[in-house]
Regions:
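A domain-start/cap signature at the N-terminus of enzymes
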Residues: 2-47, 73, 96, 100-105, ...
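Conserved acidic catalytic loop of the alpha/beta-hydrolase fold
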Residues: 39, 106-124
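Short substrate-entry loop that stabilizes the transition state in hydrolases
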Residues: 40-89, 149, 161-162, 184
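Alpha/beta-hydrolase
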Residues: 49-51, 155, 248
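Primarily recognizes the serine-hydrolase "nucleophile elbow" in alpha/beta-hydrolase
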Residues: 63, 116-172, 183
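Cap/lid segment of the alpha/beta-hydrolase catalytic domain
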Residues: 82-103
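Short beta-strand/loop motif that positions the catalytic acidic residue
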Residues: 176-178, 182
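Conserved alpha/beta-hydrolase "acid-adjacent" motif
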Residues: 184-188, 201-204
Length: 251
């Protein structure tokens, strides 16, 4: 595997840095934006992956500047992976991953390993968030890379009704944020994903939350409301995991 620059951890040791990195994964040359904090020796760092939405590869991530502020403030490694243009999955993040469509899962798997080799990464704090289609891909990580992903926070996405091979070696705590009036990714209704046959029908948001609540065998439910959102929390789940859902009332 080729990683460029090779020793970026040492190169950017004493300053906040941004760089665009190329990473060869199988036959594909993948890219990602990397932000690292000012480092001190033996400092253990968490990773936060943020996955862009459909068509978002060439544009800043939503509120990207706010995320960048967290790099030094919270001492995190911030990564914006970039999707790869493939015709058979409409050129975006692969959903309903199967044994012959693991290119995006393999990308993140390899990327975690490379970052861990270059930095003192805290393997118990590897997080993923995403917007829209990127949000949907975080559920792929929860299903197919749960041995390395600590938790996910999904914003304005969903997942397929019939999810392939979602085997939990360890449960991944989930936060899902969604606007009740979302006109693109429906909150209340199932919908069909264009002509992408491998994906098919997509879940409405209440069904999405129920899927994970049932999968984790959560026994307790708590609700709290404000004028802006409703928060539903499922706790007392297997392996001390939990599922949280913020329903945004006016969005």
């Amino acid at each position: 595997l080729m990683l460029d620059p090779v020793n970026f951890a040492e190169l950017y040791k004493n300053k906040t840095s941004k760089s665009v990195i190329n990473l060869q994964v199988g036959e594909l040359n993948r890219q990602y934006e990397l932000f690292t904090p000012k480092l001190s020796d033996n400092e253990s760092l968490p990773i936060l992956f943020a996955f862009h939405g459909g068509g978002g590869r060439d544009y800043p991530y939503p509120q990207q500047e706010k995320f960048e502020e967290l790099v030094d403030e919270k001492k995190i490694i911030l990564v914006f992976p970039l999707s790869y243009q493939l015709k058979n999955n409409e050129g975006e993040w692969q959903l309903n991953t199967s044994s012959d469509s693991r290119h995006d899962i393999d990308f993140i798997d390899t990327l975690i390993d490379n970052l861990s080799n270059s930095y003192n990464v805290d393997s118990k704090r590897v997080y993923a968030t995403g917007y829209s289609l990127g949000s949907m891909f975080t559920y792929e990580l929860a299903c197919h890379l749960n041995s390395k992903i600590t938790a996910i926070a999904s914003f304005a996405g969903t997942m397929p009704l019939n999810m392939n091979n979602c085997v939990m070696n360890q449960n991944v705590p989930i936060m899902h944020i969604h606007g009740f009036n979302d006109s693109i990714i429906s909150y209340s209704n199932q919908w069909n994903w264009k002509n992408w046959d491998s994906v098919g029908t997509m879940l409405d948001i209440p069904s999405l939350i129920n899927y994970w609540k049932n999968k984790y065998n959560c026994q307790s439910k708590n609700e709290s409301n404000t004028s802006i959102y409703e928060l539903i929390s499922y706790t007392n789940c297997n392996s001390s995991s939990q599922v949280e859902h913020y329903k945004l009332n006016s969005v």
